[in-house]
Curated annotation (Swiss-Prot):
GO terms for cellular component: chloroplast. The gene is ycf16. Its main location: plastid. ATP binds at G39, K40, N41, G42, S43, G44, K45, S46. This is Probable ATP-dependent transporter ycf16. GO terms for molecular function: ATP binding; ATP hydrolysis activity. PANTHER family: ABC TRANSPORTER I FAMILY MEMBER 6, CHLOROPLASTIC. PROSITE patterns: ABC_TRANSPORTER_1, ABC_TRANSPORTER_2. It is found in: Plastid, Chloroplast. Belongs to the ABC transporter superfamily. Ycf16 family. Keywords: ATP-binding, Chloroplast, Nucleotide-binding, Plastid, Transport. Pfam families: ABC_tran. Residues 7-251 form the ABC transporter domain. The keyword ATP-binding applies.
Length: 251
């Protein structure tokens, strides 16, 4: 049994402006685990994702975020990324004028520099990334396109998964990855996420619906309400929520 804790959140209070959004939140995740976070709109799910990644709009007023036993509560988002924390956004942004090849190479080489490794030149990187692309069922012409510009919903999500694979993230936080996907695209994305899962990395899935969890089975499901985790259960929790709604947890 693995007793090592990858992510440990202790008594976290978070505000934005004068509004408190997270309240004394606790969460611990071991390597190799998949955790799903569910809850109604406005329950704090996406806020939690952004706070773990270090979004500057949110202020932590109490508590700690430990990643591999290192306190990352106050460190910059890019440093958290270098340590192995990856956030896939619900709505990935377009970056006109920047090709995927350039964007991915810069991100990858920044990670290598942090790890005290030599950067890859463009030719070496292209050979490296082509293998990653084929594993995620993307055409190599994808590299010459601008980041997310004119992409379908499925292509944007595949791009996020490619970044997750490229950076070899230890903790991937996927914020409503199923949003806007038809069933075929959802199955494809889920298959790719499952293929990247190892006993050394962990995944947080943030979702409203059971359908994503039909294809990616979580070890634990946490339900959030008003900035708190009010319930933690097994993978069958999603089916109960689908059948009875969130209110049954308050009965």
């Amino acid at each position: 049994m693995n007793n090592r804790i990858l992510l440990n959140i202790k008594n976290l209070d978070v505000t934005i402006g004068e509004t408190q959004i997270l309240n004394s939140l606790n969460l611990s995740i071991k390597p190799g685990e998949i955790h799903a976070i569910m809850g109604k709109n406005g329950s704090g799910k996406s806020t939690l994702a952004k706070v773990i990644a270090g979004h500057p709009s949110y202020k932590i007023t109490n508590g700690q975020i430990l990643f591999e036993n290192q306190d990352v509560t106050e460190i910059e988002p890019e440093d958290r990324s270098h340590l192995g924390i990856f956030l896939a956004f619900q709505y990935p942004v377009e970056i006109p004028g920047v090709t995927n090849a350039d964007f991915l190479r810069i991100a990858y080489n920044a990670k290598r520099a942090f790890d005290n490794k030599e950067e890859l030149d463009p030719l070496s990187f292209f050979s490296f990334i082509e293998n990653k692309i084929s594993n995620i069922d993307l055409n190599s012409t994808f590299l010459s396109r601008n980041v997310n510009e004119g992409f379908s919903g499925g292509e944007k999500k595949k791009n996020e998964i490619l970044q997750m694979s490229l950076l070899n993230s230890k903790l991937a936080i996927l914020d409503e990855t199923d949003s806007g996907l038809d069933i075929d695209a959802l199955k494809t994305i889920a298959k790719q996420i499952n293929s990247l899962k190892t006993q050394e990395n962990s995944i947080i899935l943030i979702t409203h619906y059971q359908r994503l969890l039909d294809y990616i089975k979580p070890d634990y499901i946490h339900v959030m309400q008003k900035g708190e985790i009010i319930y933690t259960g097994g993978s069958d929790t999603a089916m109960k929520l689908e059948k009875y709604g969130y209110d049954y947890l308050n009965k």
